[in-house]
Every structure is written in C-alpha cells, then in structure tokens.
Amino acid sequence: MIDVNNFHYMKIGLASPEKIRSWSFGEVKKPETINYRTLKPEKDGLFCERIFGPTKDWECSCGKYKRVRYKGMVCDRCGVEVTKSKVRRERMGHIELAAPVSHIWYFKGIPSRMGLLLDMSPRALEEVIYFASYVVVNPGPTGLEKKTLLSEAEFREYYDKFPGKFTAKMGAEGIKELLEEIDLDAELKHLRDELESATGQRLTRAIKRLEVVESFRHSGNNPAWMILDVLPIIPPEIRPMVQLDGGRFATSDLNDLYRRVINRNNRLKRLLDLGAPGIIVQNEKRMLQEAVDALIDNGRRGRPVTGPGNRPLKSLSHMLKGKQGRFRQNLLGKRVDYSGRSVIAVGPSLKMYQCGLPKEMALELFKPFIMKELVQREIATNIKNAKSKIERMDDEVWDVLEDVIKEHPVLLNRAPTLHRLGIQAFEPTLVEGRAIRLHPLATTAYNADFDGDQMAVHVPLSKEAQAEARMLMLAAQNILNPKDGKPVVTPSQDMVLGNYYLTLERKEAVNTGTIYNDTNEVLKAYANGYVHLHTRIGVHAASFNNPTFTEEQNKKILLTSVGKVIFNEIIPDSFAYINEPTQTNLENKTPEKYFIAPTEIGEEGLKAYFDEQPLIKPFNKNFLGNVIAEVFNRFSITDTSMMLDRMKDLGFKFSSKAGITVGVSDIVVLPDKQDILDEHEKLVEKVTKQFNRGLITDFERYNAVIEIWTDAKDQIQNELMGSLEKTNPIFMMSDSGARGNASNFTQLAGMRGLMAAPSGEIIELPITSSFREGLTVLEYFISTHGARKGLADTALKTADSGYLTRRLVDVAQDVIVREEDCGTDRGLLVSDIKEGTEMIEPFIERIEGRYSKETIRHPETNEVIVNPDELVTAEIAKKITDAGIEEMYIRSAFTCNTRHGVCEKCYGKNLATGEKVEVGEAVGTIAAQSIGEPGTQLTMRTFHTGGVAGSDITQGLPRIQEIFEARNPKGQAVITEIEGVVDDIKLAKDRQQEIVIKGANETKSYLASGTSRLKVEVGQSVERGEVLTEGSIEPKNYLSVSGLNATESYLLKEVQKVYRMQGVEIDDKHVEVMVRQMLRKVRIIEAGDTKLLPGSLVDIHNFTDANREAFKERKRPATAKPVLLGITKASLETESFLSAASFQETTRVLTDAAIKGKRDNLLGLKENVIIGKLIPAGTGMRRYRDVEYDKAAPETEIVEEVQTTEI
C-alpha cells in the first residue's frame, strides 16, 4: 500500500492506450459474470479470477493450492495467482475495442473540447461520430476543404469521380486521424496571430481555442487520446455482485453496461472477420460507440439506457456525482468504527468536562482496551477468553472498564454540526440506563434539548488524538463562541430562574434588618428557617475578607440579602461583592451606598432603614452572562468552568426550592383594556374618513391603520407589565430571561395584535382578544396563517442555511494561518458602520482584537496609545474611543499578502480562545461556520412595504445569499460613474425619473423607476460610485466604478447590516475572509509578453508572479482587472481540482483538469481529506509533524487541575 502521507501532489491527465494496457491484468473477452451452478466466476469474464485475483484468500480457483505458504505462486491448472482476495479491489482489466470510440466527456462537454481543438461544431462532430456523415480527412484533388462533411450520396459521387485519390471517413476513426494530424505549435501560432486581428465572436472563439491548444501543449496529453482504442475495466469488488436471500443476485449497474460493451465489441469483431457489408459494420460500430457512451456517462446523449422498471442505469460518471457519489459519500464523509449513538438526557450533577456514558455502550466502545487490560491483569488467559468475558458481562469486567475510561476523553457530536462547537470532548462517567447524559450548560453550543434529541459518541484512539481532544476540544475549554468571542456557555431556563429567585429581595420578608457577624451565621439562620432567601440583612463587612473593600468599609456593615450572600460564595475571592446587577459593581467595587456604619443605625434598627430603601433588582440572564465573561477575562478557563458548575448547581437547587408554578390565576387581564381599544378604534375611523374624502391614498391609510393598532398593542403591553406583581411567576420567568418575553405575556393577557396574511402582508384587522379571554372563530382562523407560515419557513430555512454553509466552507476551506507576518504595507480604514443615523456596528467593536497598522496618539496629550503591528486589546480600544478617535487603519485579511491563507497579524486574535491566533488555525472554515451557523436565525421573508411594486427589499437569508453569490440584487440602486454635481432631476418616458450628473469633462444621465426614492437632490455634489436612489448596489458594477477597496468595504457593511438587524453579532474578520476569497481572481485584459491568456481568469498571486518575471526580463507586463466571483463560482475556480470536483459539476471539473493535466498541490483541507492524508492545519501542518510525543511525559498541570478539583 502507498503511504498517503508521503506524496506532495496529485496530477490528472488523459490515459494513452499503452497506459491503460499497463494498468490491466488481462483482457476481458466474455460478457459472462459467474456460473449459475457453481457460483464461481467465469473464465475471461467480468469477474475472472485469472485477471482480477482469487475470490478467497490464499486459494486458487481450482483448489490445488491452499494456504499462505503458496503465496505468489500461479496455479498451473487454472492460472490463478495465490494471493489475498483484497487484490480484487485494485486489479483492473481491459477490453481491446474492435473500432476506435470517442470519449463522451471530451466530445459532449460544454464547451466541446474536441470541437474546439478541431475547429468543428459539436453538431458536425456528432454527425461524424454517430455515422451520419463522412468527414474529409485527406481531400486530394477533389477541391474539398479538409474537415468538410459529406452525406452518403455526396461521398458516393466523389468516390466515383476520384476513386482512391481522396480519404473521407466516418465514426471516431475519422476524428482520430484528424486529431493525430494536428500540429499544436502551428495551431498556437495561427491563433495568436488571429487574436491580434479578430473582434467580437471570432475573438471569443479564438481565445477559447487558444486555451484548449495551450492546455494540450503544456500537459503533454496527446489529442488523439480523447479517442479510446482500449477501454479500462474497473476492479470487480468496486462493481460487486452479491447473492440475496432468495438465491437471486443483485449486481452493480456497471456490470450491465460493461456487458453491453463486450457483447457489441465481440459481435463487431465477428462481423469484421466475416467481411460483412459496410452498412452492417457501420451500424455495429455506432452501437458500440453508444454502449461506451452509456458506460462513461449514461444519459448525456440521447435517451439513457434503462434497467428493470425503466430506471436509468448508473454509469461511471454518476458514481462520482452528487451527494451519493464517491466524493461526498465515501471520501469526504466516512462512517467510522468505535462510535455509537443514543438519546440524550440531562446530567445535572456532572462537572463541566464530564458526560455520562451508558454502561453497555461504554463496554462496546472500549472493548479492545478492556481486552488488553484483562489479559495484562491476568484476569483472562488470552484475547479470545477476554472477549467472551466481555460478551458475558462478567463482574470483573466492570472494574476494568472503570479504569480504562478514566482520563480517556470521548467526543460527543449532535447533528446538524453547524459550527465547531457541534463536536466537543468530555470525560466519560458510567451511568445506568441507555441514555447519554449531557451537561446542561453544554446544550447551548449544541443547540440541543432533551425532547428526544440523539447524539453520537466517538472514541479518539491514538495518544495524539486523545491529547488533542483533551487540550483543544474539552467542553470546559470551549467557553467562547468563535463567531463573536462572547461566552456561549451561559445558564438558561431553570438555572437562570434559580439564580434570579435567589437574588430577589422582598419588603415583608421574615426578620428583615437582622445583623450577622459572618457568612456562616447567615447560612445557619437560613438553614434554621430564621430568615428567608429574600430577607434583607446586614453583615459585618470585615468578615468577607474582600480585597476590594477599603479600610473604612471594613469597619461598616454591608447591607445585602441572604440570597446574595449565598450567590457571592461562588464568585472568585478577588471580585467585588456583587450586590446589584451593574457593570460598575461587577468590574470595580461594591457601591458605597450599601455600607452603613453601626453608629448610623437608628433605634428602630436596620428594618426601618430597609423599609425606606427601594428594592434592588435581582440578577437576570444578561447579568449572569456578564459575570461569566468577567471571570473569563480575569482568570483561567479552569476557574471559569468551576464557577459555571457552581452557578448551575445553585440555579437548579433554588429553582427547585422556589417551586415556581403557573396557574390561570397568574394571568391577570387588564381592566381598562376596552377603553384603550375604543380609543384606537376611533382613530381608525378618523383615518378611514380621510381616505373616503380622498385626502390620503390607500397606501397611506393602510400604513396609518397598522401604526394605530401597533401602538394600541404597545400601550396595552406597557400597562400590563407595569400592573404585574414582581412575584408573579410569569413575570419572573420573562424578567429573568429564563423563558418568554413581554410580547408572549401580552398575547396571554392583553391582545394578540396584528397577524400576517399568507402573502406576507399584514392584515389590518387586529386580533383584539387575548388567549385568556379566548379568540373568536374569525380571529382564530386569521392567526392560523402566521403559525403555518412560521413552520413552513423554518423547514425551508434549515435547508437553505445548510446549503449556504456548505458553499461558504467550500470557498474558504484552504484559508489557513500560514505565517506570523506577511509584511504588507497596506491597511483597512475602519470607522462606525452606520445606515443613515442607525448604528449597525460601532467602531470599538471593529478594532478590538485586531492589529493596528499605524501609530495612534492621543489628540490632546500626544501620548502613544498603540504602536503599528500591536494588538488592540479591549482596554486599548476603550482608550482610543475615549480619546475621541473615530477611525484608524488596521491590519485586515483584505490587505494580507499571504498566499493560500492569511497571516497572524492580518487576522488578529482567535475569538474562540481570546489569545492571538496560531499558525495552523483553519480560519477559513471557522469563518464559514460563523456566518452559516446563525443562518437559521435569519428571516426568510422579503418585506412587502404595503404591496407597492419595486420597493421590496430583500432581507435575512435571501439577502445574504444574494451578497455572497454576487447576484444582481432585488430593488437595485442606481449609482453614478462620474464625480460631479446633480444638475437636474426630471420625469422621463414610461413614468421614469431621469437624474442628470454634470462632471468636469462629461455629463451623464441615469434612469430610475418612478416609484424608487431618490437619495440626492439638485445641486448636491456626488462622488464616483455614490448611490442616487434607495436600494442595494449591484456589486460587480460597483467594483468597476469604485474599485476593489470600496467594494470590499461595501460587501462587509451589507453582510453586517443583515445580521445585526436580526440581533446576531458576527466579527468582521469572518466576513473579511469570505469576501477576500470572492475577490482573489483577476481577468487578463492584455497578455503583454507573459504566458497568460487574454480573457482568462487567473489568481492574483499568479498574475503578479507573471508580471514580476516580465519586468525582470524587460518585457511587456500583462494588464488585468479584478473580478468578483460568487462563492459557488469561486469554489469551482479554485486551484485544486479535487476540491472543485467534490463540490459541484464533477464531470465538467474533471474533464477540464484532465485536459490541462492539472496538478493538485494538496494545499486545502478537502483535497487532503479526499486522499486520506492528514489535513495541513493545526498539528497536521508540516512544521508540527516532526514533533514526537514523549511517552513518559508527566501530565500537564491544567489537566490535573480539572481532574482533582472538587467543586
């Protein structure tokens, strides 16, 4: 076997007949497969053992030689070599064709490569190949042009006139002869000359032909090899024939297709031997051609060959194509051993880094490890004995299993794996039952819930795999979300509710105002029922030993509540005592107002003091998230995960103690609801009157009515939330962020409000009832539209979002951090992203975690805030914005010079760890996942603004697709191509508006539709590329008008606009990586003296290389313009043919690659996965491969810490 890790590139080309014969182990002469009685392969047939190897290990066909000792011998009776039966997966055969046959990929593909090379139309080629016309190969004295087509009658006529003096042939033979006669160098010279003079269609064709001719010259492929004389037969194990239960056989479609070819070929041979009449031979040759076409690509020409039940047979091309093809089904995703799946259940008592594995599952997964251990401990005598012990589930097996799984992490995966947090490592603990136990805090990252979700378990086997799983993938390490660098592990539902309830304060709670010496006293009083969780008390501040308390404060009494004392137990000691849910309290110190000197307490005690003070808000979900982020910023990951576990335990404990329930009595209907409705009803009547009098249009009336009812709902909502008791369970759920929001509550107790019709428009008749009162039949009916649309949308969105992620991953999979610094001299100017006055992404968020390109000084003090190539941390970013600086140049992926990737400096910090990014990080894939994963949260709809045509703006997922596919947007904006002043705006024909721009040298006018809103007015100055009307810009046009930098910034802004409007935060750097991939090609305008072809798409780096060469040799450089490719197109244009072929249009990509003799340097991730090599990212990079692991190395500290710390 070849060691896949040892080769550096893979090349593809056309196979010569000699090459095909050299692969083959023998010629298949008969169409038979296996003997129906003996079930043994027929000699010389499609499964022949002599050609392909024995069907049983170390045994020849007739049984003369059995056993491994005869290895390598060839049986003298049956001629079969004694070897492993596995060779039947590798050995190929061949068929010697009686007549040459054209390869359908090269003749029928678009464009037809054969046609371009011969300068013949595909239709003419088809007529010749399928024996409808003759082609003139050698015109002789006939006066005919070479390659002219002749019908049967014309050929007879010329043949009679010039017998034996000219040659015209039919079928692939004629084409082969023409291909053999082609002089590529002469053709090249002729085409280069034609390029100088040709224009229009002729120029386009000349460029296409030049590309094909150049391909053949460079690749060393012979054009005649596009015609087959010998047909290879793939190994029999890859097209198997298996016996079914009923004695019948199931076989691969390929065997049928091969059988047809062999039958027709044998018949043709016989006819040629017999000297049959020409017309019969011709017909047989045509049938052979069709049989080979069907084998290579069934259905490409004419009707496909069908099997039983009119099902088209799957040809060799279909074996590669699509989701079920070889690439996507077997090479990019394989099923793996040492894996299992089961339903998940919650494991509230687990630590952050643990999961619960069902005993019987663990027994099966770790079987080989247990067997080894049983033999080593001498519990079992040998492996076989150990196996039977495990299968019997003997008692001693369980102890061994406990030891084996200790410190052996397993990977848990939930489908769909939308981002890298969809697979995480945990340390298994054994549990009873058959469900996998999952840590409740890990559910957010997996997007899992416990309503029947299933998860898969995988066991990393090698020491390196285990180390990687533990160091990089342990759930306790993955606290931050790679898309925005915020904690993804936040408490939810019960945990939030528990902590909210714990930190609640109540006025009339038992024994309010009691003063305690220390925490222990408080806990004892609480345990004995002397105080309640919500009781406000005083505690001597000194007893907390808190480093943030001043000396003065330590002499005072801290005013807090019992619950908060308990909550602060889980917070690290160096933090301020958290008494109120504010950033100041969290980051700096406990506010002074919560300290009271003993002398200040009046005679009535603290109770009277507390009665005057307002209650402090309890801690909600957002605040808990801030606490986690703050702990993460100040401490190690280990400390954070320990605190998270404590927070989870507190939450569960106190939400159970709270016993929060919901009853119908908790839903209190607003008393003055009817008055609010009547008031708004009057407003609607007023608007309708105005419309009836013709004072406003129907469009304005509709919008006004919608606005009135929205206002009514808002008013009811505000009054409802204000009138609710703070201890109302439903209010507590929504206020804490555990579940539900104000809108849900309004629907229960207030009114349901406006609903959408099936078309997406809003129905102006609101639903005035609430669920508590009950809906009328009409109201119920209206509301079903929205519910149905919601479900349908979700289903569509999931598929669309998944496909978007796949395309994004494909285009960016080879972007890896490849070096520390690329040394670029350019940077990206960043400032606030705004849409009108609305802030989309603030400046501070854009610079944090990036490297500066310039020295930034304080405008007043001139002090240096940040130096060039220095990382802008959160503190520095705050300093910059506090200094009033509103824009700066940063290092960006847009301006990075690294080939096939980015450098550390241009990328910035790794958001998943908060540290600087390391060489080897697969940032392209992370970027694709970060943009694709929130795709399901985006809306599907195109907003209809009251049904006016032309003003629909695409938003949500469709808009993201539109941007990344570089499509012409819906509701396109008009942009100006010149700088100048708006001279005039007038009405043109067909109710269009004409905008006239007067520049320095020229005046241009632009037409906009009558309904589009203008963004400029007469006399206004405009820059090149400025928007004249509302809408989205067409990016390809913008690129040619405003240039590369403006287009990059525009695309970045547009993507951020869509996501931020939906409340999804994605870091700029992810979008930058993707947009850069879309702009990495240029189109050659003039080739100069370089080897580049005019009109061809070339990678920017190859273009600069070619020009550098030209400058060195004092030659004319090439000129080119940047091209914006959509992600699908960009994936197919990638350097790697393996990656492109596994993505889409497999046959087209492979045809092209074979003719060009392309070489795949295996730089990306996909191509390495396909050939089974370690991926060149992370520890798979060559610079890390030479590192040997030390077998006796002591375990790292962090791991020890995770293991031994009890919480």
Curated annotation (Swiss-Prot):
Provide a GO biological process annotation. Answer: DNA-templated transcription
Please describe what this protein does: DNA-dependent RNA polymerase catalyzes the transcription of DNA into RNA using the four ribonucleoside triphosphates as substrates.
Q: What name has this protein been given in UniProt?
A: DNA-directed RNA polymerase subunit beta'
What keywords is this UniProt entry annotated with?
DNA-directed RNA polymerase, Magnesium, Metal-binding, Nucleotidyltransferase, Transcription, Transferase, Zinc
SUPFAM superfamilies noted in UniProt: beta and beta-prime subunits of DNA dependent RNA-polymerase
* UniProt-annotated binding residues for Mg(2+): D449, D451, D453
The keyword Membrane is annotated on this UniProt entry: no
Kindly state the subunit structure of this protein.
The RNAP catalytic core consists of 2 alpha, 1 beta, 1 beta' and 1 omega subunit. When a sigma factor is associated with the core the holoenzyme is formed, which can initiate transcription.
Q: Where does Zn(2+) 2 bind?
A: C822, C896, C903, C906
